[in-house]
C-alpha cells in the first residue's frame, strides 16, 4: 500500500477515537421556582363545622325558649346549632338556642329574657328573639343597645298557638326572624372561637362514657345517652322530642359548664356568673374529658381547654351546652 495513503488512514483512525460520536442534547431543565398553591379551605358553618355551600345566605340568630312542663314538646330545637340550657327562677330550666346551619319553620315557645341569656348572645354577637324580660334584662338591652327582637315591639314576627294556653304558646319561625333582621338591617357575619376536629377524639386515653345524668334540682334532671354515634337527650326518663319535626334530638357534643348559681337580692330571680373561669366536662364520640372554661369579659367568647391548656376540639355537628351549679350532682356510666 502506498505509504502516503497508509499514513492518512492511520491519522483518521486516531482522530475518530479521540472524538466519540456523542449527540449534544439541549438543556431543557427549567430552573424557575415551582409555586405550590395552598389547598382551598372548605367553607364551614362556624357553630357546627358542617360544610357550607357557596351560595348560603342564612342569617344566624338566637331564640329564648321555654322548658317548663307546659311548654314541652318544643319546636325547632332539633335544628339548632347550639342550645344553651340553664335555670331561671323557681328552678325551671330554660334554653337559648342558636340557629344558622338549619332554619326551622317553627320555633318556640318563646319566653322572656334574663341577663345571663343576654350575656351569651353578646359573647356571640348575635340578635335574639324573646318576649319581654326581667327588669334587669330589659335595662341591659336598652343600656347596651343589644340586638333584641322583642315580640312586644315586633309582634308581626310571632304568632300564638291557640291549642296551648298562654304564656306557653308564643312561636316564631326562621322565615319571620330573617325578614325582621333584613328589615332592621342586621346582617351579622358570624364568627366563632369553636374548633371542630373529630380526630381529636381518637385519643385512646380519653375515658369512655355512654351515659351522663345531671341532677339540676329536686324537680328536674336531664341526661344524655350515646347510641349509634349520637347523643340523645332525656328529661327524667322521657326522650326529648321536637314537636315540629317529631324527631329525637341528634347531638354530637355535650358541654357541661360549672359555675355558681345563686339567688338574686330580690329573692326571686337567679344570678349566673359567666365571666371568670371554672371547671366542667365535654363529651363527644362516647368519651368524656374534664375541661377548664374561661371568659375574659362581657363580650368575649367562652374558651374550653383541656387540663393541659390546649383548646378542646368538638366533633362536627350539634352541641348541647349545660350551664349548671357546681354543686349539682353529675353521674357517669
Enumerate the language-model features and the residues they cover.
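C-terminal motif of bacterial Sec signal peptides marking the signal peptidase cleavage site
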Residues: 14-17
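Bacterial signal peptide processing site
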Residues: 19-22
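Hydrophobic alpha-helical targeting segments used for export or membrane insertion
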Residues: 9-11
